[in-house]
Amino acid sequence: LVRMPVLSLFAESLGAGPERIGLIVSVSTITGVLLKLPSGALSDIYGRKMLLRIGVVAFGLPPFIYPFISDLNALTALRFVHGLATAIFAPSALATVADLYKERRGAALGTYTACTQSGSLLGPFLGGWLAYTAGFSTAFVTAGVFGCIAILIFFSLHLDEPPPRVRERGLAPVMAEMGKGFLAVARNRKVLITSSTDAAKMVANGA
């Protein structure tokens, strides 16, 4: 609801040119590229619940800040921070669905992705309509309301988790465990091929 088309129109209203609009729209994706790998690994180490809670709060509350933005640099920075939500939430959410439905994993993941795509379909339509009829602030506040609803729904869930894999304090044990996870994935040719195929698809989609 925030990202398209409202974000580009809002950036344009602040004086952004085409190149700056492209940067503002895509900067949250940069955050995702940088942080999804460590975020997913940390969810394996410490459990999904903590990262899911951080992610859903980081997603739900920033829209309330957008109406107070009047500077392109501040907007770019806020988009970078807002991108943390997707980077933190998405890997843990997919892993949680896979954990909950081990025997019907394909159907569960299909349902999950269909729901996310439905939101991606309805959000731009609703956001564009609100921005046109009531202004940018109304669109952003509405996005924040939906985000708060998501927070309330998520915090009502009770997820059982195994104990953390790393009990020692300090950064070194965590980094060592993350390294084991990355190495295991890097050695799996099928995962790499599937991931590369999806990356190529996204490049074509964004061209």
Model-derived regions: residue spans:
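Structural signature of the two symmetry-related core transmembrane helices
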Residues: 50-64
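C-terminal membrane-cytosol helix-exit motif in multi-pass small-molecule transporters
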Residues: 145-165
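Cytoplasmic helix-loop-helix junction between adjacent transmembrane helices
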Residues: 78-117
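Membrane-interface helix termini in secondary transporters
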Residues: 40-41, 45, 129
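Juxtamembrane intracellular "pre-TM" segments in multi-pass secondary transporters
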Residues: 160-195
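Residue-level signature of mid-helix packing/kink "hotspots" within the transmembrane helices
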Residues: 29-37, 120-121
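Paired small-residue
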Residues: 62, 73-81
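Helix-breaking motifs and short loop linkers at transmembrane-helix boundaries and internal kinks
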Residues: 47, 68-73, 102
